[in-house]
Structure formats: C-alpha cells, structure tokens
UniProtKB/Swiss-Prot annotation:
Cellular component aspect of the GO annotation: cytoplasm
Organism: Aliarcobacter butzleri (strain RM4018)
Class of enzymatic activity (EC top level): ligase
Pathway where it operates: Aminoacyl-tRNA biosynthesis; selenocysteinyl-tRNA(Sec) biosynthesis; L-seryl-tRNA(Sec) from L-serine and tRNA(Sec): step 1/1
Database matches in Pfam families: Seryl_tRNA_N, tRNA-synt_2b
GO biological process: selenocysteine biosynthetic process; seryl-tRNA aminoacylation
Role, per record: Catalyzes the attachment of serine to tRNA(Ser). Is also able to aminoacylate tRNA(Sec) with serine, to form the misacylated tRNA L-seryl-tRNA(Sec), which will be further converted into selenocysteinyl-tRNA(Sec).
Molecular-function annotations in GO: ATP binding; serine-tRNA ligase activity
Positions contributing to L-serine binding: T228, A229, E230, E282, S380
UniProt-annotated binding residues for ATP: R259, K260, E261, E346, I347, S348, S349
Keyword Ribosomal protein in record: no
Protein name as annotated: Serine--tRNA ligase
Assembly and oligomerization: Homodimer. The tRNA molecule binds across the dimer.
Cellular localization per UniProt: Cytoplasm
Underlying gene: serS
Length: 412
C-alpha cells in the first residue's frame, strides 16, 4: 500500500510515479479529491479538539471563580457533538480512501526505465551459451520421450492442466529438491507452508482486492488456493515487529501454485508455459530498509546461478515501469533460452516491493525503540515446470530422448 502521508504531502510526486505504471488518471484524480477531503476534515476535527481543550481550561477557571458556566457548557456540548460528527465523517472517508488505495499499485523506483509494456524492457546481459544441434530442435510437447500427458490432464480437470509421468515426474521431483537445496546453501531457511490462504493474507501481499478474479476461491470459506508461495512466506510475519538484529530473514519454500490465468485466453495454449496448477520454489526476504538493495542483488544472482548450474542459457531483463507487477518497485526477470521455440521465455521474476507489502501486512522491525516498516522481496528460484521444459528443449537428442543435467543425476 502506498504511503497515505506521502500522498497527502506530495500528491503530484505520487501521481507522476504512478502514471509511469499506467494508472488511470480518473482513479488518481478521485484519489486526490478523497485524500484532500480527508485531510481537510481531519484538520477540522483537530481544530475542534483544540477549541475543546481551550474551553475545558476556561471551564475549570469558571468553576474555580464561581462564574456562570451555563453558556460555556452549551458551547462545550456543541463542540462535543460536532467532534463526534467529524470523527464519523473522517472514519468513513478514511475507509473509502483505504479501499481505493488497496487497488493502487506500488510506485516504481526512480531509476526504473520508463516504458509502456514488455517491448520496452531492457536486456541487461545474456549468460551462458545457446546449445547447438545437428538437427532441428523440437518444442517440448513434440518430443517423443513421452513425459507429458496433456489429454489425461484435461480429462482429470480441464484445459491448462497436465499430468506428468515416468521419468518426467521423477525429474520434476528432483528439480524441486535440487532448487530447495541450492537456496538453502545460499542462506535461505526452508519452510513448508499451507497451500491455502485467507483474504487478509492475500491482501497483505497485494493479490486482493484487485486480482480476485485470478484466484481460485474455496466456496463458502474465507480461503483461496495460493497463486505463489510469496503470499505465505511474506505473511508469516504479518502484523509482527521483528528485532533488527534478526534481519535479513531469507525464506524459501516449495508449493504448487494455482492461477485462473484470467485474460490469457489464446496465449500459450500448448505445453507447460501457462498452467492453472504448477510447481514453484520461491525465495522471500524481509529486510531493513538499508539492506534491501543488497539482498535484491543476492536473490537475482541466486536464481541466475541456479540456471547456470543446470547449463541453461538465460538473460537478465530489467522490467520497464509499464510492465512492473502490482506490488513491485523494481523487477529483474530471468528468461531462459528455449531452442524449440527459438526464443527466451520468463522463468523467474525477482522483485523488491520496498515497504509496499509491509505497510499492507504491518511487517515492522524495531530499531532504537522505533518501529520501522520492513522491505519485502520475492522471486522464483525457480518455476519448476518451466525449468523442466527448458531442460527438455535444451537437452533433447535427435531420437527425441532427453539427457539429464549432471547436477541432477544424484537426485534421480
């Protein structure tokens, strides 16, 4: 959640920042009017309180000097009534303001390149070498290794569900274990978390209320299937105050993820790229405000090194302002080379949300007896299904079989 105090203090600065993310001007103008009205009513309430305090002192003097207090009492009673009315108005305005603010995205960092969409993202570097083949490489769904059963996945559920079998299922499990071990070796503490979350939890990380249509809700319950372990890991510290000496908190977890993929009709309808259910190993960090840039770099490097350890060529991409996610202030995507598709595709997205999620989730740390909003960061390390298909395409053989990266053999 953006800082209401900053919004009221320097609205033009906030507007300029949010316009870089393509936020609708009508929403911003409504927000401005509501913020101004709330500020004015709050000032009226403070003025009434100040006047009450003065009259209370007068009341004490009148009583002490045995003066007639009837007229003064009427004024005090009138102010009490007015203050109650103003408190009710301010409460309603603040509820309305908070309702809108919960749907307003985070402001991008000032050094994030301006752009409208993914076409204006900036490639920072390419890491590793693309494999060469003496045959035309196939896309993963056309390989004859027979690991993916799309038809039975659809039969069991619906489109965008896949059953994985045999060596493919074993490789999926091996990748999960390898990714968790890799993250643990770099200082991340492993957690096993619920695969469901309540609405307060999802509001804390920014999925609700704005993205309710992309979530699978449990009918009759205040529970949703999680779209990412970021939700669970970040909210482990929801409404908590952490001693600064404990920071940074580096967390990792494997979970299945569930997304309706609303708005993705017609996109990536074949293969494992875009599924309603997929496995992912997640990294989350909770840091002090001065630590977050260093930890952001650590997380980007962790995911990149993981791809390199698997022998997968990939590129680092700086997202422009218009392609940033709702909660992100800055994001680096890692895109893996898929020779069958002859292009790079996203496999990890690492974001620093600054204090945006922490303000929503009330995650704070104590420093010099003061409670300070933490910074929260998150990133995939990695999306398991996309890593599986990347291995299938990069390690495919002419006969349709797939070699296994050396580092995974001990996990199989």
């Amino acid at each position: 959640m953006i800082d209401i105090k900053l919004l009221q203090k320097d609205f033009d600065y906030v507007v300029k920042a949010l316009q870089k993310k393509g936020v609708d001007n009508a929403l911003l103008n409504n927000l401005k009017d509501l913020a101004l009205k709330t500020k004015q009513k709050r000032q009226e309430m403070e003025d009434v309180t100040a006047e009450q305090n003065l009259l209370s002192k007068e009341f004490g003097r009148y009583k002490k000097e045995n003066l007639d207090i009837s007229e003064l009492q009427e004024k005090i009673n009138a102010l009490k009534t007015k203050k109650q009315e103003l408190e009710d108005e301010v409460r309603t305005l603040e509820d309305d303001l908070n309702s809108i603010i919960l749907s307003v995205p985070n402001m991008p960092d000032e050094n994030v390149p301006f752009g409208v969409d993914e076409n204006e993202n900036v490639i920072l570097e390419v890491i590793g070498e693309k494999p060469t083949f003496n045959f035309t490489p196939k896309e993963h769904w056309d390989l004859s290794c027979d690991w993916l059963d799309f038809e039975r996945g659809v039969k069991l559920a619906k489109s965008r569900f896949t059953a994985i079998k045999g060596d493919g299922a074993r490789l999926e499990r091996a990748l999960i274990n390898y990714m968790l071990d890799f993250n643990r070796q770099r200082g991340f503490n492993e957690w096993y978390v619920p695969f469901m979350a309540n609405s307060n939890t999802l509001q804390g990380t920014g999925q609700l209320p704005k993205f309710a249509d992309d979530l699978f809700k449990i009918e009759g319950e205040d529970l949703y299937l999680i779209p990412t372990a970021e939700v669970s890991l970040t909210n482990l510290y929801n409404d908590e105050i952490i001693d600064k000496s404990e920071l940074p908190l580096l967390l990792t977890s494997y979970t299945p993820c569930f997304r309706k993929e609303a708005g993705s009709a017609g996109r990536d309808t074949r293969g494992l790229i875009r599924q309603h259910q997929f496995d992912k190993v997640e990294m989350v960090a909770i840091t002090s405000q001065e630590q977050s840039d260093e930890i952001f770099e650590k997380m980007v490097n962790c995911a990149s090194d993981l791809l390199s350890s698997l022998g997968l060529c990939h590129q680092k991409v700086q997202l422009c302002s218009g392609d940033l996610g709702f909660s992100a202030a800055v994001t680096i995507d890692l895109e893996v080379w898929l020779p069958g598709q002859n292009k790079f595709r996203e496999i990890s997205s690492i974001s620093n949300t600054r204090d945006f999620q922490a303000r929503r989730a009330k995650i704070r740390y104590k420093e010099d007896k003061k409670n300070i909003l933490a910074h929260t960061l998150n990133g995939s390390s990695l999306a398991v299904g996309r890593t599986l298909l990347a291995i299938m395409e990069n390690y495919q053989q002419a006969d349709g079989s797939v070699k296994i990266p050396e580092v995974l053999k001990k996990y199989l």
